[in-house]
């Protein structure tokens, strides 16, 4: 039986000859068995990263190597000895996995994981739990599998979660939705579900995965996690709902206290656009310098400083 612990990433280095061998196997597997069906399927690179994560997990759990001829289902990658169906999820990036990251307002943002809604809502994809991983790769120009023996690749084992809890608590974002990444934003090109790392079940070691049984899955299905938003976005949304007359300052103070955030949060739009609007209101005679001075205490204009 599994014993809950807070998620803490487990790094597995995929370097030297041993790591290269695993990367070579992932490359060979995807080359021989590309997934060319299904809407919004993963790219060849994404399929390669997913295969590598599964190959690594199988190796460290003492399981047989990945084999397309005896894969039990499209919905999951392997069965645990307890009968639990596991799907390994992997996201690749050039940075190591961090549980929190700083933006340029020095306020931490919590890390998240991503799911495809079409998989989550397809009952034919029979799976009990997802094992969430993150693959640190070389630069985008040089990270094509299998890479080289000298390159540094690291797989982070982040934790696990039941499919049913992701369906219940994850936040669905339609294609084109905006999300924050580091010091900038991007829009999702595909439909997405965000689920935050802090809400995963942690693993002290990878072989602890073998202890998960149906009672653990049921307990996770019933578990109530925290917000699947960054604390910063929760405050931004609260500000917006106050402006729309739905919430009030009591809710803002509550969320700020719960998140332990006292700094001013940077807006999504440029602060220059805020000042432009305020100056227009002043020209219309609706505000005075007092409001502009107050805004200057909270927001900072961003002058052009050259390329």
Locate the predicted segments by residue:
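Nucleic-acid endonuclease domains
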Residues: 1-81, 89-307
């Amino acid at each position: 039986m599994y014993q809950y612990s807070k998620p803490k990433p487990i790094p597995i280095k995929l370097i030297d000859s041993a790591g290269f061998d695993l990367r070579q196997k992932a490359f060979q597997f995807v080359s021989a068995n590309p997934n060319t069906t299904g809407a919004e399927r993963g790219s060849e690179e994404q399929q390669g990263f997913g295969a590598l994560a599964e190959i690594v997990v199988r190796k460290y759990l003492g399981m047989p190597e990945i084999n397309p001829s005896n894969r039990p289902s499209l919905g999951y990658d392997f069965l645990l000895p307890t009968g639990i169906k596991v799907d390994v999820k992997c996201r690749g990036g050039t940075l190591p996995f961090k549980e929190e990251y700083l933006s340029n307002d020095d306020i931490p943002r919590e890390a998240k994981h991503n799911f495809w809604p079409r998989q989550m809502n397809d009952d034919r994809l029979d799976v009990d739990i997802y094992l969430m991983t993150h693959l640190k790769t070389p630069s985008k120009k040089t990270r094509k599998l299998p890479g080289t023996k000298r390159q540094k690749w690291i797989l982070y084992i982040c934790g696990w979660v039941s499919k049913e809890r992701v369906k219940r608590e994850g936040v669905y974002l339609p294609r084109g939705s905006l999300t924050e990444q580091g010091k900038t934003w991007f829009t999702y090109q595909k439909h997405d579900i965000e689920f935050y790392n802090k809400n995963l079940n942690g693993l002290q070691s990878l072989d602890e995965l073998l202890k998960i049984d149906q009672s653990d899955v049921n307990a996770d299905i019933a578990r109530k996690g925290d917000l699947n938003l960054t604390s910063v976005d929760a405050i931004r949304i609260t500000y917006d709902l106050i402006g729309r007359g739905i919430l009030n300052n009591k809710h803002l103070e509550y969320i700020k206290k719960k998140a332990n955030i006292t700094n001013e949060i940077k807006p999504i739009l440029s602060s220059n656009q805020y000042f432009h609007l305020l100056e227009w209101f002043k020209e219309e005679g609706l505000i005075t310098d007092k409001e502009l001075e107050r805004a200057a205490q909270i927001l900072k204009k961003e002058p052009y400083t050259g390329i």
